Amino acid sequence: MAILTSKASNIPYPIQYDELHKEAVLQKHFDTASYLSTTHTTRNTMRYFLYFAYDGTNYHGWQVQPNAVTVQLRLEEAMQTLLRVPTPVTGAGRTDTGVNARTMVAHFDTETPLPDPAVFADRLNRLLPPDIAVHRCVPVTDTAHARFDATSRTYKYYAIDHKSPFAERYAWRYRGTLDFDAMNQAAEALYRYTDFTSFSKLHTDVKTNNCRVTYAHWEQEGEGYTFTITADRFLRNMVRAIVGTLVEVGRHKITLDEFCAIIEGRDRGLAGTSMPGKALFLHDVTYPEELFL
């Protein structure tokens, strides 16, 4: 399902596509064998970055896990069908259950260079379900890594204060009023810190909870407010925990000083609740130019 934004609203909404049964797609649109049997005869491993979007509503997050349908699972299934060999993909990050992505990046390797990455992206799209859409496929250096080479990631969180049959699927609806000026003052305080243990999911496998936040701001857009945050990396559940704590500032339940004390306390139990994942979008991921061929 492709994700677009209405001109009159800051809230993303889905464009519906007709369902195509996978076998019918293969029969009608593909000749995989002829696609792979090209003039490229030398076996030369190539790495590619895949840029794609997804609606996370029906998925248990990005990463493959037992007994669950995930975005990575569906993508790797489609890759194997198209390339006819198991093809693992490595994502730029791990979004949680229900979280969406306007731009996710993943890398994968092929033993034979793709004849035309644009054609590959188009054919992969035809195999994927309607709620996953590939934007483009680009060749990169052999050592380029979608996760470790990312220089920044940007997330957006959408909030509305009224009932909307179109927006509520991808936005958090709040009751009463929020002091967004106070929330932005607290958001600016994030620049002064690097240890965000208080906003991290417990018992994760990361070696450090240090991140460098370079932008964090609430802005009125269309019919609601959008929180945009950019950092070099994010911890599990970090953005939703930050938003939940900023909401407590906006409701005057805690002061700016108390918000800072929560960060300095390095204790997840001090921070606010984790906000619903449906309103969170991975918006962009950036990389050094030298990675691209």
Q: What do these predicted ranges mean?
A:
Residues 10-16, 20-22, 41:
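Juxtamembrane/membrane-water interface recognition
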